[in-house]
From Swiss-Prot:
It comes from the Bacteria. This is Phosphatidylglycerol--prolipoprotein diacylglyceryl transferase. A 1,2-diacyl-sn-glycero-3-phospho-(1'-sn-glycerol) binds at residue 137. Its EC number is 2.5.1.145. The gene is lgt. PANTHER family: PHOSPHATIDYLGLYCEROL--PROLIPOPROTEIN DIACYLGLYCERYL TRANSFERASE, PROLIPOPROTEIN DIACYLGLYCERYL TRANSFERASE.
Amino acid sequence: MGNGVQPLDPVAIQIGSISVKWYGVIIASAVVIALLLALSEANKRKMDKEIIVDLLIWAIPISIISARIYYVIFEWDFYKNNLGEIVKIWHGGIAIYGALIGAVLTAIIFSRIKKISFWQLADVVAPSLIIAQAIGRWGNFMNQEAHGAETTRSFLESLHLPDFIINQMYIDGAYYQPTFLYESLWNVLGFIVLLIIRRTKIRRGELFLGYVIWYSFGRFFIEGMRTDSLMWGDFRVSQVLSLLLIVLSIGIIIYRRMKMNPPYYMEDKFGKVVKKK
């Protein structure tokens, strides 16, 4: 590559003709970490851990499929003439919001089958979701995707970024905004916020809704910086959906507090979750 800048090798392991890319390794790591965290959260809420494992078994493949369908719908001008590409997910093209929609629908159906509270289940997995997204964005980093507009090396250096990040943002002769990093850091901060607010008097389901609000708020602004947004006419799909999710989540919180009076949770000083009315 010109300018003496070399990107990181996207292949983690190469065995003959078989290659394992860092993207897959990072996503798999995110899933494992999310599972371990969710199991810990389930234990705090005295929920059967097998419920979390069973949910994950269903949610992972369904989320991948829904993430792909979401992407294909908004890139239909390409896929309608290349139908064979629809199933070639390894060529890229999945969307986090599509995955989230699939995961939520799976959890709703799963909770009804298991006869447990969807909101309780959602609260258990909320911290796992946001930390998994924070980790997963580094897969985009390794693939040199999900970046922002063109910028300069001096600007990136002014952010005090390590050289390996700056060099990885050098793509086809130009430097780009590391929007993957902005979103990853936003999600890490969101994870910390969730850990803090669950020590306050919040109602069942509000930890999950807080996650949705936090992620959507950050995604709205970060999406405006990206160059690969899915579009709906003149609008960025993720920005529209972010606004809708923020309004919907706030509306659900207000409605449930006024009409349903759900129980609230707090953590004690030992990190155990206690339920009160």
